[in-house]
């Protein structure tokens, strides 16, 4: 139910025989070692970490893999690519992998709604990967979230995180959500918006860049920290790593090493060029993309999207919880108490 869903996943076509790993789950996955054929990696503690395969979600993990930060901290890490964040959580709960990196909304729904016994201990993303954008032909008439009353807004699906986030933004702006019509467009959202078949849409990159070039107006860019502060009240906890609760004590040295590796990757990516950032991603995930443009997009958003450290921001996490309640994705009164473990890196 997040932006890291099946429609945005770019699963690399490598070693797909590992599907059996998932104990019958209907997930198409791939596994790539953190550092191929190096003695340091071979001697390290082997771990499997699943994530949703969305490009912007995975940048810190791919930098940790390709630049050797996992190996530096004694980990022989395999990144397991799943079709969406829900699949990554299922793999974790089913003991198919050791860790799952997902958006908080996925982890929170699994924890609050179905009782998944997991703990999040590190964060690698602090903003949602969404922007609320007008169609080019409505840019002059729709200038704020309040102006969405009486308009049609395209989302990937009702109940998905883009829908929930829009409802939360409407509430924050004092707009009447009952006066807004939602259209579910799935993967056809970009073209429908560009052609003016709907008034407004909730998009990701590179759709945001393409629409801007076409003359669309950006009402809220959730990938911009200043916009998030203005419209959401601050950062909005996103990607983070979870482990099975019953194993966190046994794995504590490994968990600490993992947080250090990811922390080093977060620092490193801030100094990398766009070309270097794009090159850190597996070629199988970037086939058909303009790598120069992709690198530019990552470099443009990195200071906002990725935190300086892996420490958990509980205020940012509460904003996500409030958006899920506003969208009806978790029950009012449901608590995230116990989901976050701030003892590893603080919070």
Language model: regions and residue ranges:
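Short, solvent-exposed loop/beta-turn-alpha elements that line the ligand-binding surface or hinge
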Residues: 72, 224-234, 303-312
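N-terminal secretory signal peptides
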Residues: 1-20, 29
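Pocket-lining segment of extracytoplasmic ligand-binding domains
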Residues: 188-282
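Short, glycine-/small- and polar/acidic-enriched structural segments
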Residues: 3-4, 41-185, 199-205, 220-222
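Secondary-structure end/capping motifs
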Residues: 248-329
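N-terminal signal peptide c-region/cleavage motif recognized by signal peptidases
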Residues: 35-37
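Small-molecule pocket liners
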Residues: 59, 126-132, 216-217, 237-241, ...
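Conserved C-terminal helix/tail region of periplasmic/extracytoplasmic solute-binding proteins
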Residues: 318-347
């Amino acid at each position: 139910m997040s932006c890291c869903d099946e429609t945005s996943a770019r699963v690399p076509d490598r070693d797909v025989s590992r599907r059996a790993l998932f104990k019958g789950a209907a997930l198409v996955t791939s596994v790539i070692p953190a550092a191929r054929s190096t003695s340091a990696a071979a001697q390290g503690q082997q771990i499997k970490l699943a994530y949703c395969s969305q490009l912007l979600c995975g940048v810190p993990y791919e930098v940790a893999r390709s630049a050797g930060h996992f190996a530096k901290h004694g980990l022989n890490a395999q990144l397991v690519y799943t079709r969406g964040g829900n699949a990554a959580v299922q793999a974790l709960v089913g003991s198919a992998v050791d860790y799952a990196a997902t958006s908080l909304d996925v982890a929170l729904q699994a924890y609050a709604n179905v009782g998944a016994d997991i703990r999040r201990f590190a964060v690698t993303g602090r903003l949602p990967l969404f922007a609320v954008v007008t169609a080019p032909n409505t840019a002059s008439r729709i200038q704020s979230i309040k102006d969405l009353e009486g308009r049609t807004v395209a989302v990937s699906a009702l109940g998905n995180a883009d829908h929930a986030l829009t409802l939360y933004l409407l509430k924050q702006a004092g707009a009447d959500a009952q006066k807004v019509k939602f259209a579910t467009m799935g993967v056809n959202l970009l073209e429908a918006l560009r052609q003016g078949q709907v008034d407004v849409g909730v998009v990701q990159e590179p759709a945001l860049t393409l629409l801007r070039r076409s003359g669309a107006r950006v009402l809220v860019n959730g990938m911009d920290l200043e916009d998030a502060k203005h419209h959401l009240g601050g950062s909005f906890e996103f990607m983070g790593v979870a482990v099975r609760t019953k194993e966190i004590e046994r794995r504590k040295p490994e968990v600490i090493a993992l947080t250090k590796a990811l922390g080093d990757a977060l620092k490193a990516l801030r100094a990398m060029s766009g070309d270097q950032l794009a090159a850190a991603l597996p070629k199988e995930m970037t086939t058909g993309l303009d790598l120069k443009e992709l690198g530019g997009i990552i470099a443009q958003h990195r200071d906002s999207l990725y935190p300086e450290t892996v420490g958990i921001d509980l205020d940012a996490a509460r904003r996500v919880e409030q958006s899920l309640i506003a969208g009806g994705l978790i029950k009012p009164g449901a608590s995230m108490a116990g989901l976050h473990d701030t003892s590893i890196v603080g919070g």
